[in-house]
């Protein structure tokens, strides 16, 4: 079932869809989302620039603006993601269907390129479809920026 990007966001926003979007909007750009307070945003931006293979930056929002103006101007990043993992001090502390109650006026959102974007091309080429997405932590160090550092994940 291939929905348009607007249809999948609407289904998520209205509670008709929760979870991963793999196989649902396969012909559209899909992105990972990182949201940080403005005080941490510059360091993360530099981290993404230094490590563009593992953090391919698609868009950065203005502080407090939950709308990705370039990629999806009809989207609301507080409500239009299938499931949000809330990470504090490096650990997942909660998973919620929307983050309106958590949103702060100093939040900056980073949209990062995702392998979900090309998963449909793999299916079209005859590769078996899967609901899981593999991520692998390598032994390659990322170039640090401020408080952001670690091994490359692909």
Sequence positions of predicted segments:
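Long, contiguous binding/interaction regions
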Residues: 2-15, 123
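N-terminal start-of-chain detector that recognizes signal peptides
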Residues: 3-9, 29, 81-85, 101-102, ...
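A short linear-motif detector with a strong N-terminal bias
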Residues: 10-15, 37, 63-64, 88-91, ...
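Amphipathic repeat-derived elements
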Residues: 10-24, 92, 145-146
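N-terminal low-complexity or amphipathic/hydrophobic leaders
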Residues: 20-96
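Conserved mixed alpha/beta catalytic, RNA-binding, or beta-rich assembly cores of soluble enzyme
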Residues: 86-154
